[in-house]
């Protein structure tokens, strides 16, 4: 993904979901992330990166397990969590930096 650095350097927070198609918890995160986007709207960008299709990007960002959520604010990593994360926790963290 050649424009990844451009995406995470946006002026608004960017939540990156590193996932895999075969991952059960990743599938459970999908509707949670949709709810986050519905609640926060244009205040956040959410992108999904398939680690099987982008292994070099996953390696570069030291993704060891999926799902891994990474939140960037103006290109700087401000939060990172592996595993299933609840909507209210994600919304709260994004609102703190917005």
PLM region descriptions:
Residues 15-16, 46, 69:
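Hydrophobic beta-strand anchors of alpha/beta hydrolase catalytic cores
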Residues 71-98:
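Non-catalytic, surface beta->alpha helical segment in thiol-disulfide oxidoreductase systems
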Residues 11-12, 19-22, 65:
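Short pre-active-site segment immediately N-terminal to redox-active cysteine/selenocysteine motifs
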Residues 51-57:
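Structural microenvironment flanking redox-active thiols in thiol-disulfide oxidoreductases
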Residues 27-40:
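Typically the conserved alpha-helix immediately C-terminal to a functionally engaged Cys/Sec
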Residues 1-13, 55:
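A short beta-strand-turn-helix
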Residues 20, 51, 74:
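Active-site loop/turn elements of alpha/beta-hydrolase fold enzymes
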